[in-house]
Amino acid sequence: MYAVIKHGGKQYKVSVGDVLELDRIEGAEPKSSIELNEVLLVKGDDTKIGAPTVEGAKVVAEVINNARGKKVIIFKKRRRKDSRKKRGFRRDFTRVVIKEIVA
């Protein structure tokens, strides 16, 4: 059984036991449980497709930790102008493990 969920403007295909890195969920403490209610599709013995979401479906996940990703360097340069910018960016994310899919 798997489901397609929407979180943070992105879609994820998940099944029980999967580990995901979602955009930072404020107030999510490690070892706590969260519910993801925007379920777009559930595929098991039969398929349920939402319009836009499946009624009564949810995905239960347990928070592993909150962390920051690797630094990405953004470098802009204009040739022959002695003009350059250097910026760094680190993505904040919440790592979760999928515990249950309720359809």
Curated annotation (Swiss-Prot):
GO terms for molecular function: rRNA binding; structural constituent of ribosome. It comes from the Bacteria. The keyword Phosphoprotein does not apply. This protein binds to 23S rRNA in the presence of protein L20. It comes from Nautilia profundicola (strain ATCC BAA-1463 / DSM 18972 / AmH). Belongs to the bacterial ribosomal protein bL21 family. Part of the 50S ribosomal subunit. Contacts protein L20. InterPro entries: bL21-like, bL21-like_sf, Ribosomal_bL21, Ribosomal_bL21_CS. GO terms for cellular component: cytoplasm; ribonucleoprotein complex; ribosome. Pfam families: Ribosomal_L21p. Coiled coil: none annotated. Keywords: Ribonucleoprotein, Ribosomal protein, RNA-binding, rRNA-binding. This is Large ribosomal subunit protein bL21. PANTHER family: 50S RIBOSOMAL PROTEIN L21, LARGE RIBOSOMAL SUBUNIT PROTEIN BL21M.
